Amino acid sequence: MTSDDTVWPGAGRSIETLAALSPGQAEAVLALLDEAARVDGQPAVSEQGRLQLRGGEREGVRHLLLSAGDTLVGYAQLEDTDPVEAPAAELVVHPAHRGRGHGRALGTALLAATGKRLRAWAHGGHSAARHLAQVLGLTLFRELRQMRRPLAGLDLAEPKLPDGVTVRAFVPGQDDAAWLAVNAAAFAHHPEQGSLTQRDLDDRKAEPWFDPAGFFLAERDGELIGFHWTKVHAQEGIGEVYVLGVRPGAQGGGLGKALTTIGLRHLEAQGLPTAMLYVDADNKAAVSVYERLGFATHETDLMYRTES
């Protein structure tokens, strides 16, 4: 664990910036995140952010711990890995310690750490988060929709694969490199997904929810050209279209629709009542496809940024 600095923003607060968390610090942050999610009904930090709490230092990632006395009352994670966009942040204040300026203190520290170039998520678009963004001088520029549909009575036509295409399950270890390459190509315009590394993939394979039987690979002549990775949220009874991608050059032949259908049928067969997915609101074509498949917007995550 390395400590970059500690600042004292007043009101009995201290903010420590770390390149990595100790196991004890990670557990304390996870407990804070779980309590905030219980109260808010929405995680304040993404899956990627939670995975980055453990495993030591990660390139471009910093953790900000806000304490009042000896009590951890706030957390922010700053990720500076995009070669073009401003650093991205997620932050949360413990529900029992809100309304005391802690969120503003964290936001101000994030702006100072990034030279006032910042993007910040407000998961679920809660009013307090929107107000904080306004106070910090950030403006809305991205909306990420979570869409859902019932799986009961799913009535989808038999998937029609393009000529010469076969589908099989992912084999851990064997398919890692090929999948990372196709994922990078399919999401070259989307650094959050396209920049996933072997370490990121290994993190996910180590999670309890990982099941290669629900990770579908489409091949033509032995080459990977597309995939649909599903995820089961067992506690919530929800199946997710986790990642769906088609390699450039293989798009436009109906492979994406076929892979979507295959994944949804798999989730239905698990007895799950609901399917969900995430899609950018400005991706009108994808939103239209999912609406035709019976999905409707459930909630929206908002991203704000500085104007510089």
Swiss-Prot record:
Pfam families: Acetyltransf_1 (PF00583), Acetyltransf_7 (PF13508). Residues 16-152, 165-308 form the N-acetyltransferase domain. Acetyl-CoA 1 binds at L91, V92, V93. CDD domains: NAT_SF. It is an enzyme of class 2 (transferase). Monomer. PANTHER family: AMINOALKYLPHOSPHONATE N-ACETYLTRANSFERASE-RELATED-RELATED. This is Mycothiol acetyltransferase. The lineage of its organism: Bacteria, Bacillati, Actinomycetota, Actinomycetes, Kitasatosporales.
